[in-house]
């Protein structure tokens, strides 16, 4: 992630803005993330774990900072999640279902979780809760209703023509064209990666996040049982 960020800022002639937060892998604690987010889904716990480490590092470096801005909601708005990772999804179901990644399969359907209303709210908690833990107030502009409304008007089916490759490229292309039209900037676009995947190499990542969803859930339940 540091190398990609360096490349990104260098191409925009903004390299002086780069600050790297170095964290020891032993300081990444998934069970802390379970407690803070009150969740147990592995992908969310991975993201929250790395987020906690990042925010702890920022807080140590800048004790007086209070405001955070992030990009949560962008993947949901532009349907930019790997379809191959979910056996229940097809390109057709993704482009044809309104707000699929925000609210699941519909108002009357069973959601991703009995605790959260859908994927977007779960994502908001994994950012909001760690930020609150370290005294930050966050804002995710892409989750604003006005932007979601615009995203819902995008003709995904026509633009992708049944191609997952075109769907995955769509977000970067929209951002690139928008930045060029609005600011005259050639915005660098990289292949999509999850936030947490740039924090460790693959072997260290597998060791640190080896627990199953059942193990995370058992720990989550133990925290609540201990206080009843």
Please identify what each model-predicted range represents.
Residues 1-183, 196-210, 221-226:
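ATP-dependent adenylate-handling active sites, centered on carboxylate activation for C-N bond formation
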């Amino acid at each position: 992630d540091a190398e990609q960020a360096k490349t990104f800022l260098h191409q925009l002639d903004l390299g002086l803005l780069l600050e790297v937060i170095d964290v020891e892998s032993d300081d990444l604690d998934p069970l802390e993330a379970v407690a803070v987010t009150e969740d147990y889904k592995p992908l969310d716990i991975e993201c929250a774990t790395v987020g906690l480490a990042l925010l702890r590092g920022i807080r140590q470096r800048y004790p007086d900072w209070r405001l955070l801005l992030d990009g949560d909601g962008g993947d949901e708005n532009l349907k930019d999640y790997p379809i191959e990772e979910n056996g229940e999804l097809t390109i057709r179901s993704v482009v044809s279902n309104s707000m699929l990644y925000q609210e699941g399969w519909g108002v009357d359907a069973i959601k991703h979780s009995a605790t959260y209303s859908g994927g977007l709210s779960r994502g908001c908690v994994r950012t909001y809760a760690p930020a609150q833990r370290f005294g930050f107030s966050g804002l995710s502009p892409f989750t604003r209703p006005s932007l979601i409304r615009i995203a819902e008007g995008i003709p995904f089916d026509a633009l992708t023509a049944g191609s997952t490759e075109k769907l995955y490229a769509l977000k970067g292309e929209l951002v690139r064209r928008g930045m060029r039209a609005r600011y005259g900037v050639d915005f660098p676009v990289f292949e999509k990666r999850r936030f947490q995947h740039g924090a460790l190499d693959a072997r260290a990542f597998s060791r640190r996040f080896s627990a199953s969803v059942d193990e995370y859930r058992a720990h989550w339940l133990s925290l609540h049982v201990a206080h009843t």
